[in-house]
């Protein structure tokens, strides 16, 4: 073969690799810039603010704010709204953990039940699916407005009026403004709103399960309960694990639901609400940033423990 042809092919390959690399960088760069501008830089800047005294007095010259070390973190830990004060006042940290795990567990369980129901053949399945999906697609502001009207302790409240007419209760109850009860109601409302996400994910996996597994189990004399625990659940365990992980992260950082329902009062103040209050009510941006970093660290600890447990269970198989 001619040496010139070999050199030409080598040069052509180099040009092709160069063009491919340039195309790859051209495609990656816009996304990388967006991620840097909207995720990485704000996160790093937030950590920087948490170690400085930043408020309205120096907001225009924030990069010259005085360094205070871990003082903002100490103030957060000593704050009445953050600390566990007893069973009557859990504090924002404990409330966040209870709210996140309870709402995530309940929404995942409801999603599993709904998916099992929709996986069965019956008339009106499309209508049932649309009804189940409604809480997830409806605007949060509209949902909060309707539920506040339903749970209103005044005579105009639908639920109180109904319960009074049925003689189930003697006096009206303030479902969203009673310490203890309000947190339970918010957890139930959160589970109702977000169970369709789990339902869709679980249903898609259920429809991919091989029917021959159930047919073989039927031949062996297995009943419905045995099929569920020995076939369905093992097939769903990874999907349920992924759903629980995602919903836990989202619920742990949830702000709008609780803020619209209770404003963070009556024992429902979570860390995201506390961050908002420090930053935009007290204008103590350093303490607000420190609270958000603490929230992130708590979430990371739970995620590391959860993922390590999952990896151990996978390794045993």
Locations of the language-model features?
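Short, Lys/Arg-rich, polar N-terminal cytosolic tail immediately upstream
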Residues: 1-19
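A structural signal for multi-pass alpha-helical bundles of membrane permease subunits
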Residues: 19-317
């Amino acid at each position: 073969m001619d040496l010139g042809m070999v050199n030409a092919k080598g040069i052509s390959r180099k040009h092709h690799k160069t063009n491919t690399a340039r195309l790859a960088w051209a495609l990656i760069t816009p996304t990388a810039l967006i991620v840097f501008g909207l995720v990485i830089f704000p996160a790093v800047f937030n950590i920087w603010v948490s170690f400085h005294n930043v408020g309205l007095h120096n907001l225009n010259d924030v990069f010259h704010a005085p360094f205070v070390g871990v003082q903002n973190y100490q103030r957060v830990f000593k704050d009445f709204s953050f600390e566990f004060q007893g069973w009557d006042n859990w504090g924002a940290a404990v409330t966040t953990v209870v709210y996140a795990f309870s709402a995530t567990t309940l929404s995942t369980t409801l999603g599993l039940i709904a998916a099992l129901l929709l996986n069965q053949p019956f008339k009106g399945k499309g209508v049932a699916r649309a009804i189940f999906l409604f809480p997830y697609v409806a605007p949060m502001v509209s949902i909060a407005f309707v539920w506040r009207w339903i749970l209103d302790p005044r005579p105009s409240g639908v639920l109180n009026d109904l319960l009074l007419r049925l003689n189930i209760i003697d006096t009206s109850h303030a479902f969203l403004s009673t310490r203890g009860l309000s947190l339970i109601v918010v957890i139930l409302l959160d589970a109702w709103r977000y169970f369709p996400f789990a339902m869709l994910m679980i249903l898609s996996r259920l429809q991919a399960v091989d029917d021959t597994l159930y047919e073989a189990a039927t031949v062996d004399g297995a009943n419905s309960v045995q099929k569920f625990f020995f076939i369905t659940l093992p097939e769903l365990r990874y999907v349920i694990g992924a759903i629980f992980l995602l919903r836990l992260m989202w619920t742990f950082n949830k702000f709008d639901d609780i803020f619209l329902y209770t404003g963070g009062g009556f024992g429902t103040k979570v860390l995201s609400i506390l961050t908002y209050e420090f930053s935009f009510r007290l204008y103590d941006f350093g303490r607000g940033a420190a609270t958000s970093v603490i929230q992130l660290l708590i979430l990371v600890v739970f995620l590391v423990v959860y993922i390590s447990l999952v990896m151990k269970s996978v390794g045993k198989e």
